[in-house]
Amino acid sequence: MIIYKDCITEDEMFSDIYKIIETPDGMCLEVEGKVIQREEGAIDDALIGGNASAEFQEDDVGGSSLTSGVDIVMNHKLQETGFTKDSYKNYIKDYVKQLKAHLEKTNPERVNTFMKGAQETVKKILGNFKNYQFYTGERMNPDGMVGLLDYREDGITPFMIFFKDGLIIEKC
């Protein structure tokens, strides 16, 4: 399994169990999820990577509460946050500076391409600002990446957008 983490906070943002598409401009990854329901405290079997034990079957006793939400958010403990358009502009300006500094250390030849592409990507984000819900990593570090949640044209399929250059890949 591959885990994608925020390069600044090292918070887990998503994994390769989802459909992942690179945007045509190469700046972002779109991660497609599903709206799910889960019992409070239950662990999704899809995250375990094995088969459920035949020896122990839990009875549905009732009384447990169901929560529903987007699987990417629930499985990776992303935390919803809020922005006005102006506060997002301030955040993204600082975040792009941090990513530039990160790239200067880790991938200097990518810096110019990233800076040009980031301007266009931010314009697109601001143009669709009202469509997004915003999520940080589990630690809610304000310096870290903010994933953008939107829905496909069908109005049912959720997807999240993450800056590709803000992610580190960890194989488990």
From Swiss-Prot:
Keywords: Calcium, Cytoplasm. It comes from the Eukaryota. It is found in: Cytoplasm. InterPro entries: Mss4-like_sf (IPR011057), Mss4/transl-control_tumour (IPR011323), TCTP (IPR034737), Translation_control_tumour_CS (IPR018103), Translational_control_tumour_p (IPR018105). Residues 1-172 form the TCTP domain. Gene3D superfamilies: Metal Binding Protein, Guanine Nucleotide Exchange Factor, Chain A. Its main location: cytoplasm. It holds the Pfam family TCTP. GO terms for cellular component: cytoplasm. GO terms for molecular function: calcium ion binding. Belongs to the TCTP family. Involved in calcium binding and microtubule stabilization. This is Translationally-controlled tumor protein homolog. It comes from Xenopus laevis (African clawed frog).
